[in-house]
A protein has these predicted regions:
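Beta-rich carbohydrate-recognition and catalytic domains
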Residues: 1-167, 175-178
């Protein structure tokens, strides 16, 4: 990152965390920023590592926990549940190719993972009333589509496939409070 006070003169670029880690879908919760950051090449793509990071200012990041070193996990989103638990849904790059669902208690130190049976790239969570939804790219050999699923009991139940062309990843979800 770089900083400026006038929009014309900028500081020297500096990293906010270790080189090689990508901060993915940063979330704000209880006065801090969080990201499930991953290293895509460490030392090889098969050795990916996903870490939960925390920041007070969004610029300087510290390690909370290592979530996983398995299944070539990468792009992920976080969701804090009313019971205090934390959920993470992450894209995987192994042969199975389905998204992995991780759960932890409020301390976010120990994570338990389970395959969902559904490929979800670039996942994003949203809660509406007492229901949890996830959107992302469903990547298949015959083409990619953007989908919305309801997330129930660790599984993705398809709600709708959106008209899709090209790279259909990186969706966002906005819940209308009315």
């Amino acid at each position: 990152f770089a900083t400026t006070t006038d929009g014309a003169t900028w500081s020297k670029m500096q990293g906010g965390y270790e080189p090689g880690f990508w901060l993915w879908r940063v979330r704000y919760h209880n006065g801090a920023f969080y990201s499930a950051a991953y290293a895509a090449v460490r030392p090889t793509p098969a050795a990916r590592e996903t870490r939960l990071l925390r920041s007070e200012d969004g610029l300087n990041w510290e390690l909370v926990s290592i979530m996983t070193t398995e299944r070539m996990a990468g792009e992920a989103d976080l969701l804090w549940r009313p019971d205090g638990s934390v959920w993470v849904l992450t894209r995987t790059g192994d042969a199975a190719g389905d998204a992995e669902w991780f759960t932890s208690d409020a301390g976010m130190k120990t994570w338990t993972g389970k395959g969902t049976g559904t490929p979800v790239h670039s996942p994003v969570f949203a809660t509406w009333k007492d229901r949890v939804f996830v959107a992302g790219r469903d990547y298949r050999k015959d083409g990619s589509t953007t989908k919305l699923w309801e997330f129930k009991d660790g599984a993705c139940v398809e709600v709708v496939t959106l008209p899709s062309r090209g790279d259909t990843a990186y969706p966002g979800l906005l819940v209308d409070p009315s």
